């Protein structure tokens, strides 16, 4: 991605942040793909643009629930035209916020690490579930399963709600849980009407200068969520998905030890992943 005339202040698994001033930053979504907390060598073409469009759609759709990082400005307000033109579809002028130090994970269905946990313990992240549940089954109620926020290259660790309260304070933990569950519930209902089941998702929150909880980073994208096609959903299976699960499944079968460097992902797997991302965008946002 081309360099721009702003100072880079952070480079994450997928996003790069650039300083505009003490209140604003430019958030740029790259085409990088991370799986199992490792950044893969092979980018997914146009992925950053698709993620930005999906995120922006949800930020607007869910704005009645809570404030978000939008400033109301575009890249053309902060960059020269030649730079703005290159980045306009993958960059957002965002408020600078103090990140809440936990990942807010919400699950509506039993899958992934939650399914593995349930098979071993009958619980997901310490939350007891009914006996005899199957893979991909809808949970009796939506559950909040926070995790630590690891540095790039480290693994996030699931924690209990009590531990979450110890890290960020009980009152803030309760607010994060309530907002995350409401965001997921409303989004899942809408997505289902468009043919997508949102199995689970991860929200990121920050605090503004007044201490107001604010939704930030990315929202309900194929990178932060597990999206399933509703017409292929079947309890007791690992449903196909619209997200990077396609790459994750390929990596799982490759015999890779999940430590950097990752193996080279075949071109057809990359192409199918691009198609999945684009299909999710179309289903969610088309009129």
Curated annotation (Swiss-Prot):
One of its GO terms (molecular function) is ATP binding. One of its GO terms (biological process) is 'de novo' IMP biosynthetic process. One of its GO terms (cellular component) is cytoplasm. Its EC number is 6.3.2.6. Pfam families: SAICAR_synt. It catalyses: 5-amino-1-(5-phospho-D-ribosyl)imidazole-4-carboxylate + L-aspartate + ATP = (2S)-2-[5-amino-1-(5-phospho-beta-D-ribosyl)imidazole-4-carboxamido]succinate + ADP + phosphate + 2 H(+). Belongs to the SAICAR synthetase family. This is Phosphoribosylaminoimidazole-succinocarboxamide synthase. The lineage of its organism: Bacteria, Pseudomonadati, Pseudomonadota, Betaproteobacteria, Neisseriales.
